[in-house]
Amino acid sequence: MNSPTASDPIVRTLDAPETKDMQEAFLPGESPQDVASVIQETMDIFDKRMRLTHPHCFCYVPSCPSPLAWVGDLFTSLYNVNAVSWDVSSGPSAMEQGMIRWLAQQVGLPPSAGGCFVSGGSMANLSAVVAARDKLLPPMRRAEGTIYTSDQTHISIKKCLHIIGFDEHQIRVIPTDHLFRMDTDILRRTIAADRQCGRLPFLVVASCGTTNTGSIDPLHALADVAEEEGLWLHVDGAYGASIALSDKYRHLVDGIGRADSISWDGHKWLFQTYGCGIVLTRDSASLAHSFAVDAEYINSTTPHGAVNFYNLSPELSRPARAMPLWFTLRVLGRRQMGEMIDQGFLLARTAEEEIRRYPHWVILAPVTASIVVFRYCPLGLKDDDLDTLNLALSARLLAENVASILTTNIRGRVALRFCATNPATQADTITKVVQQMDQMANTMPTCGLGMCKE
């Protein structure tokens, strides 16, 4: 499979009739089909997708996977190991255990740290908040438990809190400052007010690389609050924890190693195939306290120092998820992986500089990592009309195959969001895309939006 070029379509999407036709034509029948025709059908099915590896695809954090990850994934599927326990998977389990120690070291966790590979950030967050609940909340007081997030926290946190039984009224949403970082002063006051009302604060969720802007919460300050208040600090580093592998930008995540738990996605900024998620805990016993099980049909014997991963995760049967990442890092080394991450910083800063060169464009948030949020603001239009215009511009960029730059909401207003994590993309590509975007924006019809230009 060749990587797409700029002239290839960024996305191909089924419409309703095509969906019906595909489902009717390609579902299994009573008679066998020849392999060659089914391979062609497979390619036809996968052709209808967003090409995240396209050089003009800037819409999602999950990055272009390294070909090395494909090879590691191929071996993982080929051997089809059930990495559930040491007795059936001692080799892959040993490497998963080793990778957990190595990753924990990269983010500054102590030697006592542990963890496991999971399907992605959502499952990593779920595992971490279960561990926090079981460590700090007595079962009879769970209805009083209170969690502190920010207005930039990823939706997976709210989802996993709901799954494990917490109601909306138990979740505090702390405002962020002008840098889109959790406001620690408001956090302190909110915790104090909750204690006065008889509630039981137990968990603070920090973000290391928010999805909206790439912002990183003040990790040291939040760790101080958590330590002083006796709370569990979870850092959602699904996107930004990878910055720890960069020599040039590692300082941005200073303090992440003070967390009680960290979620991390290899399929975001470590260039892995889906699904490569990691949950790390400061204390290796934390996950076992929540997930360890036994049964008469489990006959696993574990040598001293080894691990049965079914005791560290909600899952029992599980693939050897660590192997593709191990394979990639074993070949590349940490330094080259860090340089690939650095390229995302370069591309984002190039985009910011180029956008600022043109009139009527506004950068809406500081560029921290590889995300730029911005807005086209020609004079004479109201905010609501600008929202409509930016939505239309995003749609047209994709429809005309210029770029996939989707939208988000920043402080209640529509913003264009650019995310560059493909290490193969060069800065001159960004320059050309921004130029094309500006040219297109200047030709957008604005009749009915307070001014008339067609």
Swiss-Prot record:
Its Enzyme Commission number(s) read: 4.1.1.105
User: Coiled-coil stretches, from where to where?
Assistant: none
User: Which reaction does this chain catalyze?
Assistant: L-tryptophan + H(+) = tryptamine + CO2
Q: Which cofactor does it need?
A: pyridoxal 5'-phosphate
Q: Does the keyword DNA damage apply?
A: no
Task: Quote the pathway field.
Answer: Alkaloid biosynthesis
Q: What does this protein do?
A: L-tryptophan decarboxylase; part of the gene cluster that mediates the biosynthesis of communesins, a prominent class of indole alkaloids with great potential as pharmaceuticals. Communesins are biosynthesized by the coupling of tryptamine and aurantioclavine, two building blocks derived from L-tryptophan.
What protein name is recorded for this chain?
A: L-tryptophan decarboxylase cnsB
Gene for this chain? cnsB
